[in-house]
């Protein structure tokens, strides 16, 4: 009995079963821990996990980010790196968590929370953030995401928040954290301000009023300024009209009224008018006008025209209505003239009792306000328009721009530093650096940090009644200034800590705010390691080498990490960042629970398995959106994973028969071996280059091409070497090439398909406990033969053209044909032609010249393209073309252009029709210029040979079904019509040799299997 050196496998084993088997293997053998130990103290590579919140289920988009992260880390392990900071992370604070809690309790506003109790509310928030942590951990295991979950950083922990306190104290002491009363984006539903990067994530394209309003000039009857606004609800708070000092304005008369507006807008608003005078905007400055609505007080210095450069000619009339209570630019004008701010809107976004529309939400009052303007002859024109407007990115409420006391981080002061540090970052894709991300940095706004909410990192600022402020940077600082350290630093416990003012000795109470949760995640670079309190933080840990998340994090985590690191360390937070786009449903729609198209990560993995899912994520660039495509995922499995299972099975079955065991790669002598090893090593170079540059999708494409060439070219053309004869030197070199190529391919795939690669690696009698402990393949340069690769590429194209042409002619591959003609500019060496000849399966294969091609070619000019060049000579050219069609064709094919009496015409100016002559079918490859012609005539001799080949194929299938070893002899019984009998008799020896049949008998046996061969029924039985 021969020893089984390589385990025979079930090639139909499901990918799910493979995943589960390998997951158990890793756990039982502590592979993850062993990799960490074996790579300790090697070249450091720091990773930082973008922290999700575990109060929601992981979806298929999360799988993609985890696939990218894990692929990069596995690759770095295999290329000799010690991965630092490979811990998970959990984002625990903020509005998303609070809104879920409010929904659970049925709360409508902040008053409900305070009546319920901050302590109980926050306790629910704390408990809820880990609601789905078990599912997250299961998904991470199933997808193969190797991170240290036990030591994950968690933003709600005291150590983490203490590091943030240190950072905020540092910013405060450097005058970068300041309190100011100014206009901020404000969510009336959540009752808190938002930062500019949060606002950027919530824009919607909506229909809003477009209103042209008449403001009466003071002391001048029937003279008005026409101002434009999309927020009529702000008109009761109007205090100024703003013009651009350098633009041209006109005073015109129409229908007995006079109007001021931008000169360039007159024609669009008036059909019939008389120009009175033109002005520069600065000439209008200081003109007073009547208060538009007499419901609010009349502040001193208000109701006048002022000039400012922010006014543009793009929309409206060039005259902007300014309400300092509701716009940042307006607010600055109000400050310039020291006016009292008119704010009739409460923090729920409703008008107060000073206006007739008391109790209405501001935008709900728009129609009533427009009606008021119409009734009082103050409305010039009212329309609607579509434009982008910000909504709360968490609850979906329309944001207001509202005046509040807010703590700001002065990001605007470090814009130059942000841009300089951005230059140090490798962005993938690179256009984000100076595009979406760089543009955002150029306009970086001061960060509205404080939130008038409950569940978050408390702002570490205390204030006494004399308005002295104190920033706390650690728990010890609480003791230093006369307080105590609560067990939990969250609200409400921290609110009870009273300190002693170091300036005046009076009591200090904490500013009641929490901070923007984006500061939490943006602090992960240092706070995850409890810097500066922990001594574990080193230069190797910062900046981190690699991060990746979805594209929207250019306005989120990527941005806040960058800002915080630039503020605190004058450094970029990360060196390499891969931005990932979204996974869409099968119809290209964004997935959500409300639409019913949400795909849970665990369901996706249970349907397809981790390796097929991971390969699917890399079918295109990760930064391009992709739709879930069941057919594509099935093709990925069949073309790559199933193919490799079959390649391994072929190797193992034959190697076990021949008792072959791989020891080392042998120098290739056979042309196919040389080509296969050249392709392998060329691929290794390309794959490493792309993996090093985070282009995983491109690396995978090269691997997929190699798998196809290994199976469909090398094995297909080499089968007989494995089936025939004893284990001689040539056969041993074939085994060596096949084993080595298969093993190195599996190792290349390992970071992308970790389970599948481990499965096949273990079957190949490995040298390491895990494929992931192997070194990543390195190219053996001496095996690379570029000329041979180029020639074989053309040979493969010829085989593909033959396959396509046969398909179109309905001639099977096993049916020999009379003649194949090939036209190609590249001459193939004879030994390559000999190799591909059996695949072409023709009695005669001839390489021909262009004028020998059985084609009728007509070339005609595309008049739309040549007329301008030929002009009056176009008739002469058409006559020339008619007489010299073949010559023109050859010139265009060889040179890409022709010269007609000094006029150069290129091949894209012509239309070429090719009609095949006689009994030929043909195909061509546009890229290489190869033409292939097949003679479609099949005479009786060819037909019989084709039948014989079909019989051989059926017997081989039956041998495989019986699990016969390749050396086992059989006896074959056949029953068929005269044509098939004639074919068997003529090719008896060939059939015997190729099927290992010791005897072939014509006999009708009731146990015979029926086969269909070209509409003929053939009965075959084989016995050992």
From Swiss-Prot:
Indicate the family of this protein.
Belongs to the class-I aminoacyl-tRNA synthetase family. IleS type 2 subfamily.
Q: What class of enzyme is it?
A: ligase
Single GO molecular function: isoleucine-tRNA ligase activity
What is the recorded function of this protein according to its Swiss-Prot or TrEMBL entry? Catalyzes the attachment of isoleucine to tRNA(Ile). As IleRS can inadvertently accommodate and process structurally similar amino acids such as valine, to avoid such errors it has two additional distinct tRNA(Ile)-dependent editing activities. One activity is designated as 'pretransfer' editing and involves the hydrolysis of activated Val-AMP. The other activity is designated 'posttransfer' editing and involves deacylation of mischarged Val-tRNA(Ile).
Give the source species. Answer: Picrophilus torridus (strain ATCC 700027 / DSM 9790 / JCM 10055 / NBRC 100828 / KAW 2/3)
- The protein's predominant localisation is cytoplasm
List localization entries. Cytoplasm
Family matches, as NCBIfam families? ileS (TIGR00392)
The record, for InterPro entries, names: aa-tRNA-synth_I_CS (IPR001412), aa-tRNA-synth_Ia (IPR002300), Anticodon_Ile_ABEc (IPR033709), Ile-tRNA-ligase (IPR002301), Ile-tRNA-ligase_type2 (IPR023586), M/V/L/I-tRNA-synth_anticd-bd (IPR013155), Rossmann-like_a/b/a_fold (IPR014729), tRNAsynth_Ia_anticodon-bd (IPR009080)
Q: One biological process GO term for this chain? A: isoleucyl-tRNA aminoacylation
Provide the residue positions that the database annotates as binding ATP. Answer: 593
Its keywords, alphabetically, are:
Aminoacyl-tRNA synthetase, ATP-binding, Cytoplasm, Ligase, Metal-binding, Nucleotide-binding, Protein biosynthesis, Zinc
Q: Which SUPFAM superfamilies match?
A: Anticodon-binding domain of a subclass of class I aminoacyl-tRNA synthetases, Nucleotidylyl transferase, ValRS/IleRS/LeuRS editing domain
Subunit structure and binding partners: Monomer.
What is this protein called in UniProt? Isoleucine--tRNA ligase
The family database entries (PANTHER family) matched by this protein are listed as: ISOLEUCINE--TRNA LIGASE, CYTOPLASMIC (PTHR42780:SF1), SOLEUCYL-TRNA SYNTHETASE (PTHR42780)
Q: Where is this motif: 'KMSKS' region?
A: 590-594
